[in-house]
Amino acid sequence: MKDLLKFLKAQTKTEEFDAIKIALASPDMIRSWSFGEVKKPETINYRTFKPERDGLFCARIFGPVKDYECLCGKYKRLKHRGVICEKCGVEVTQTKVRRERMGHIELASPTAHIWFLKSLPSRIGLLLDMPLRDIERVLYFESYVVIEGGMTNLERQQILTEEQYLDALEEFGDEFDAKMGAEAIQALLKSMDLEQECEQLREELNETNSETKRKKLTKRIKLLEAFVQSGNKPEWMILTVLPVLPPDLRPLVPLDGGRFATSDLNDLYRRVINRNNRLKRLLDLAAPDIIVRNEKRMLQEAVDALLDNGRRGRAITGSNKRPLKSLADMIKGKQGRFRQNLLGKRVDYSGRSVITVGPYLRLHQCGLPKKMALELFKPFIYGKLELRGLATTIKAAKKMVEREEAVVWDILDEVIREHPVLLNRAPTLHRLGIQAFEPVLIEGKAIQLHPLVCAAYNADFDGDQMAVHVPLTLEAQLEARALMMSTNNILSPANGEPIIVPSQDVVLGLYYMTRDCVNAKGEGMVLTGPKEAERLYRSGLASLHARVKVRITEYEKDANGELVAKTSLKDTTVGRAILWMIVPKGLPYTIVNQALGKKAISKMLNTCYRILGLKPTVIFADQIMYTGFAYAARSGASVGIDDMVIPEKKHEIISEAEAEVAEIQEQFQSGLVTAGERYNKVIDIWAAANDRVSKAMMDNLQTETVINRDGQEEKQVSFNSIYMMADSGARGSAAQIRQLAGMRGLMAKPDGSIIETPITANFREGLNVLQYFISTHGARKGLADTALKTANSGYLTRRLVDVAQDLVVTEDDCGTHEGIMMTPVIEGGDVKEPLRDRVLGRVTAEDVLKPGTADILVPRNTLLHEQWCDLLEENSVDAVKVRSVVSCDTDFGVCAHCYGRDLARGHLINKGEAIGVIAAQSIGEPGTQLTMRTFHIGGAASRAAAESSIQVKNKGSIKLSNVKSVVNSSGKLVITSRNTELKLIDEFGRTKESYKVPYGAVLAKGDGEQVAGGETVANWDPHTMPVITEVSGFVRFTDMIDGQTITRQTDELTGLSSLVVLDSAERTAGGKDLRPALKIVDAQGNDVLIPGTDMPAQYFLPGKAIVQLEDGVQISSGDTLARIPQESGGTKDITGGLPRVADLFEARRPKEPAILAEISGIVSFGKETKGKRRLVITPVDGSDPYEEMIPKWRQLNVFEGERVERGDVISDGPEAPHDILRLRGVHAVTRYIVNEVQDVYRLQGVKINDKHIEVIVRQMLRKATIVNAGSSDFLEGEQVEYSRVKIANRELEANGKVGATYSRDLLGITKASLATESFISAASFQETTRVLTEAAVAGKRDELRGLKENVIVGRLIPAGTGYAYHQDRMRRRAAGEAPAAPQVTAEDASASLAELLNAGLGGSDNE
């Protein structure tokens, strides 16, 4: 029997293939697939349940219903293999051929394929250059189309109605040819000469200038070329033969009660066959034209419904009023073939159960219930039982296991040893959602999980369930052990920090044991070592918190990596000395000699991993957990109501606030403040009161007064349980304690506005009904938000994975010198992220020099690890150019040096690592922690936004970058440049603070001067924008005519008069073309030139500008000539959280984007139109000026005559990433997206490495638009893969030809996913129909480069361990070796089979 199985296995040989091609099927091709024509709509005989002949389930066409048995029963058994029964015509073979044999239907009249007709843009329409409306009218028999005009005045493709057709017939007789229906379209398509048409269009393209026409022509050329190149014929878009799906893929299953469950496809096929047969009969009868026409139309509709039901007109419904599922519905959507069956298969050998805590487990173990283990490891147990001779057959083994005999349990123990299992918790948001453990058999029915891996799984023990999977093959077990074992996943791939970090109880226990306490029992002792400390504690002679001196032996690694001992007496506590016993050798004592909070413990594990490596860290983590649990239990920390201490001052603070509110109410009633001001002030008062209460409360909780040994009072950190939990980072936060013991504070209304009466009570006092009611809204909104957030975050992750899935590390070094400059992230006065955090684990792109010298500090191509980063910090390096995936030169994939360190492993990344997916998971996984809301800025926040000065925090020296300035009459610097930055440098040369300085700011200190901390270095008026003169002289008014271009206004309060320039809309007809300006002249009245140019100093004034000078006044440089009031933009909403991240990755244009200068040059304003200003930028080199129309209401940042650089901001607003890419380049757009995304995550306290965002940006920049084709095959304006252009240009340049020039494109992640070269990947993402239609017409080849395509075709993915397999396959292919599948010829096969059968099936037991 075994030989027989072996033989049958050898028959199915695996196909080796490198690519998959999709194309249109020609009628002959469809016939060649088919095993016979389906002529009847019948399915099976309702009495015998046998398939009807020539019907949809016909056994003659599709194969036998039972294995090796014909329908009438004449031939049975294996020996008649391949015989065709002469009675019923069925071939004797396996039933499974019914899954692969297709049939066909010969259509009596051609029908159009709806995908090529209706999937926009319509391929048939584009090819014929006819509107879709017209084609539809022809296809559905409403009008005629002219196919051949002959000698008449009718043109080809002209549409004729019934009457026009009859008139033409009368006039011309049979001179011309016009038809209707699909045959007409087919004739048109058939008679097209694609190549000639192509030539013609190319000529037209060269002649035309209009942009829209060009676009249309390129579209058509591309389609025609695709047809020519792929060998598809246009007329194949019209079906003359319809393939029929194999019957087992559209099953018909009898239910009990004589009814049938059937696939909808059978109904759809039946309609097609019925209508087709009726049409044949009508044609044979030569029925009247109108009847035949109607039948043809119905046939077209039936075929449409079969292919894609509901795409045209109403969907055909079944008996239960639900639309039938057509072929297109089978493959698209979440329930379609791609996502349901090809990418999401179910797994055999798996189980699931509830999880509970296993605090006694080691990190690499999990507790597995015996019942589950027995079921999961069945095949192994059967095998072992047979091997041992305890069971003769599988059946006997099965019986033994079912009876649960004693020997079975022993064998289970053996089988399980060293056999890892995979544990998975849904939702699997990142790769740490599946990890491998060694099972430990336990009683009960719940899986036990190690507490430290909960953070990675995001699991808790409130009823979560987890699934167990068994890796069956040896390779799978190896991979699980080497790569997926929980002990090998200590660092998070998102940020390279430990993810196996104790939380909650463990943190509390460690914090409690490392706290110190004044005058505790045993204070002042001197102990010989940690052992003695533990003995004293256990015997009750010393408290854990007692301050003692202990002799400690530390070990330090020397230069050779050997451990060197060093013993000293340390001031410490008993608890810390006890904890030292579990710390591995090689770490300094300082790391435990402090009160350990969560952050400190995380840092401790990180240090341990970096110094000592993986194994000691794992053991240490386990020991930390055991110790933490033990001492948390001993601490007895618990929460009682008295722990929530309400500050005495609370009452008084609240009554003060109430008094202030009453006062403002009075002011409002007497009309001194407006309603809006009153509201904002009230809210400010309450917010301040809340802060005071919570400060008083925290001060109260934080410290307690105790008597020390000398009898004096001393303050020490409190041992209040609630405070300890918050302080250690175990649970809770200051904000939560505030609600428990302070006051709840202000609440929001459903519309997002703040209710002005706060909740003054806290939870300890309890809320009254009104307060409770106000709180309900926020609570409910929180829950609703969470539900929305999960869905949105999941969808973002899906899009990210899809765009990045094919990015794999494919080579070691691409050799590029490109890279991005990394500087610390500084916002205002604080360093948000120091340089070391940003460059750690990256590779330098250029030599890093010692500041101020030419000495090389770090050579190029160095992977910066911790020690290098220390060196950079010591030498206070401020900027490092590092390699980045965005600038990597590898064609498909990236190189290891551009990526840098593998964050989860701590060394340079390996080849074959799937960095795209890791990046997508790292960005998507914290998505659920981001907020969903848009922030309304109102009240206190909006007033703070109008800053008017810069006050530095630290002392140091000032450094100004991209600055133009003049000195005013009082000797201060006045800034006249737009994007000036002011940085504060400390004495080591490090940047500490960074500020933007606006135009017109007055600086108190100049470049390079020293400042003290807290000094104000710059100030300006936030409400107006000044016009600063750069020269001294006398003011001369030009075109400033009272009543025409200006008007005089007098301020009521001060009595000063000023001139206001009128807006062009307010001027009289005479003043329309005048340009009011201030000219600076010298004493003789000659023009003064702007220094460094030959332009006269003349300042044009925009509308609404206020001038407070008189004609002829003497002024000096740096003085303000005029002021332009800035309209306050009102309260702007800031999109934050998840929607913001999605907007950035989708590269959406903001509503009113900033306007950037397209070229460098001098600004001037041309003729205005109604509502728009014409901005003209004239380049200095005299080339063509650039013009742009800008709406009047936009506030411009530039004056006439000012010089701007390409990419400078002309009008403020959110910048559009596309503009940044176009004007400032790839690095600028990368920096913009990375910084903006990081801002959102940083606000939530989530750390993500920049690399991951850069990986996604690289994928967004995959496409380029051809600007000039050169000698390449590309079309101008065509969008192509960037790597394709690079490869083509390299080849062209090697042959001495001109390459194509291109501009990079930024695509949103959805667009980029759909625009990938792999049609399989795109089709399984979204818009399946459109993608497949496009691919088929173009005859695309899918090279199966990405991960997704390979999963879909069922191969190992070309990443990780599969990467080597694919490399090897390619190498073997290149060497021309044959695939290793055994080849068997038909004769050999039948001979060996006969031999086997003759030997008898019973005789093989003796083996």
From Swiss-Prot:
SS bonds (residue pairs): none
Pfam families: RNA_pol_Rpb1_1, RNA_pol_Rpb1_2, RNA_pol_Rpb1_3, RNA_pol_Rpb1_4, RNA_pol_Rpb1_5
Coiled coil: none
Binding site for Mg(2+): D460, D462, D464
Highest taxon in the source lineage: Bacteria
Binding site for Zn(2+) 1: C70, C72, C85, C88
Gene3D superfamilies: 1.10.132.30, 1.10.150.390, 1.10.1790.20, 1.10.40.90, 2.40.40.20, 2.40.50.100, RNA polymerase II, clamp domain, RNA polymerase Rpb1, domain 3
First-tier enzyme category under EC: transferase
GO molecular function, one term: DNA-directed RNA polymerase activity
Chain positions recorded as Zn(2+) 2 binding sites: C814, C888, C895, C898
InterPro entries assigned to the protein according to its UniProt record, in alphabetical order: DNA-dir_RpoC_beta_prime, DNA-dir_RpoC_beta_prime_bact, RNA_pol_asu, RNA_pol_N, RNA_pol_Rpb1_1, RNA_pol_Rpb1_3, RNA_pol_Rpb1_3_sf, RNA_pol_Rpb1_4
HAMAP family cross-referenced by the UniProt entry: RNApol_bact_RpoC
Protein name per its UniProtKB record: DNA-directed RNA polymerase subunit beta'
Native organism: Escherichia coli (strain SMS-3-5 / SECEC)
Encoding gene (name): rpoC
